[in-house]
Amino acid sequence: MGGSNLHSAWAQLFVRALAQAGVRDLVLCPGSRSTPLAIAAMESEEVRCHSVVDERAAAFFALGQARVTGRPSVFVCTSGTAGAHALPAIIEAHQSFTPLIAITADRPWELADAAAAQTIDQTKLFGDHVRHFAELGLPDPSPLALRAVTRIAAQAVTRALSPTPGAVHINARFRKPLEPVDATGPEPWQAEWEALMRRAGTRVVSARAGVDGRAIEELAARCARAERGLIVCGPAESREDDARARRAVLALSRATGFPVLAEGTSQICFGGLTEGVVMPASFDSFLRAPEFRAANAPDLILELGAPPTSAGYATYIAEHASARRVVVSSHGWNDPTSAAAALVMGEPVEVCEALAARLGGAALSLGRGRRDWAATFARAGEIAAGHAARACAGDELTEGAIARMVASACPAGSLLAIGNSMPVRDLDTYCPPSARALRVLHQRGASGIDGLVSAAAGARVAAAAPVTLLLGDLSLLHDLTGLLLAAKATGDGRAPLVIVVVQNDGGRIFEHLPIARRGAALLERCFTMPQHLDFAPAAAMFGLAYERAGTAGELARALAAGYQRAGATLIEAVVPPHDGAARVARLWSDVRRDVAALGSAPAADGAAADLQTP
């Protein structure tokens, strides 16, 4: 259609329909084939448009936004290999049940398989890592095709959110001319298009299953019988109702007397009032002690959320496979051991609330067996926490001290973004639960180390609250262009973004693994890969304030200065490269020695029989 603006109208209608379905943020990468979408997004008054040069960083930026808001952010890129760079973020969205929409602009079908430039097969580019794929199709003036544009947009948002949140891929083809043209007069499709632009979006009411009453009744009965129960909280996505989730877990603990083993990424550790609840700190450390594991066999485990990161806990449940373990999960089959006795598919907060209400009304007696069991875990937590605190004392800077200081310095109500490999584990080893409210952002879906800075920048834009990111040096190296996003994200001057990089010169998590025994040369060449970098020039290039800390005192001052700034700060916290593994091994040895003396809580009558209940 020469002289037609159908392609522009098509894109405007699509962006408008996305906004009507709930989209508020669109992340745009440069490219010619996506021109109609870019212009439509920039001219829209209903979405915020964020311009990002690098597609991989852009996709993680959108992911970070979605993690904070719970709404799908939209990533838009041009044709060719551009979309492929979004795959890591798409995978993380898929694995972590985070809503995300990727729109890849594409060439028309007649250019496929003909050696046309920047033309690849983009159909189902992301494979099974998306909840839904759709072809938007080439712009078509028919009324049905125009109406289908609004439907496809509504479907994309709906499928990104329910029944299982995750990523959605829309492939949008455009022919040239891609830019708006001077139309010669009214176009035949214009009246239908204008009516659709005025029309309210389709209202989607998702069916939602509640908590199964019979499952709650059966689980409540098991809780009432169990003498050695545990509530285990693995990684969970931060939501607006984090406080409700904490209240529900703590209420269930009070009703049952079961200790709560909560990881730092569970959204339970920071902000809850824990009176009357045993929530032992550093539980991974004491569960690494064989004597403690052998002496304290559980008879019931309620595991909430994603599988815990803790290696100590993994060993514990492997050694007590006869204990009944019930996994409660909103989405996914969260049982990598394939040994759970039951999976309750439902919102953990609702399951905990229902259980607490039923058990609270039953006047459950917390007898001596339960009290002794809880006291043993409380004492083990005190021992582990004491050793962790002593390991971080003084002015010497260590990996554990960095994690502890960063978690303690985060302003109340702010966001702590935690990197993978060692930082997420140091958070659990060295940082005790706190009444100070924090939202903890993490990438435990696929547990990758890429895109962390970009995602934190997206979170900062979405939250308009202070964000602190703790990550390793190789993670930062993976996402250097994210520093540009960090600088831009804080340009509004509303809140700081403080990035703390643990500079231990390489991937030191491998020094904790059996491969470390094969010799230093192999380890360095193939695994830890030290790069001997100084990140000060990178901070200068991207316009971030920079601090270098070699002692605890210097880190404390750098953190304080970072939170005083409205912009972005990069703090390079330098520790000896080969120090971490030896230090944590000593910590675990000290904890093992002291918890071994605790013995076991005496079992009540019937407890052993319940261990064998199918």
UniProtKB/Swiss-Prot annotation:
Subunit structure: Homodimer.
Source species of the chain: Sorangium cellulosum (strain So ce56)
InterPro entries for the chain: DHS-like_NAD/FAD-binding_dom (IPR029035), MenaQ_synth_MenD (IPR004433), THDP-binding (IPR029061), Thiamin_PyroP_enz_TPP-bd_dom (IPR012001), TPP_enzyme_TPP-bd (IPR011766)
Function: Catalyzes the thiamine diphosphate-dependent decarboxylation of 2-oxoglutarate and the subsequent addition of the resulting succinic semialdehyde-thiamine pyrophosphate anion to isochorismate to yield 2-succinyl-5-enolpyruvyl-6-hydroxy-3-cyclohexene-1-carboxylate (SEPHCHC).
Origin: domain of life: Bacteria
Keywords assigned: Magnesium, Manganese, Menaquinone biosynthesis, Metal-binding, Thiamine pyrophosphate, Transferase
Family from the record: Belongs to the TPP enzyme family. MenD subfamily.
Record-level Gene Ontology MF annotations: 2-succinyl-5-enolpyruvyl-6-hydroxy-3-cyclohexene-1-carboxylic-acid synthase activity; magnesium ion binding; manganese ion binding; thiamine pyrophosphate binding
Pathway: Quinol/quinone metabolism; 1,4-dihydroxy-2-naphthoate biosynthesis; 1,4-dihydroxy-2-naphthoate from chorismate: step 2/7; Quinol/quinone metabolism; menaquinone biosynthesis
Cofactor(s) the protein needs: Mg(2+); Mn(2+); thiamine diphosphate
Gene3D superfamilies in alphabetical order: 3.40.50.970, TPP-binding domain
Cofactor-binding details, from the entry: Binds 1 thiamine pyrophosphate per subunit.
Catalytic activity: isochorismate + 2-oxoglutarate + H(+) = 5-enolpyruvoyl-6-hydroxy-2-succinyl-cyclohex-3-ene-1-carboxylate + CO2
EC numbers, comma separated: 2.2.1.9
Protein name: 2-succinyl-5-enolpyruvyl-6-hydroxy-3-cyclohexene-1-carboxylate synthase
GO biological process: menaquinone biosynthetic process
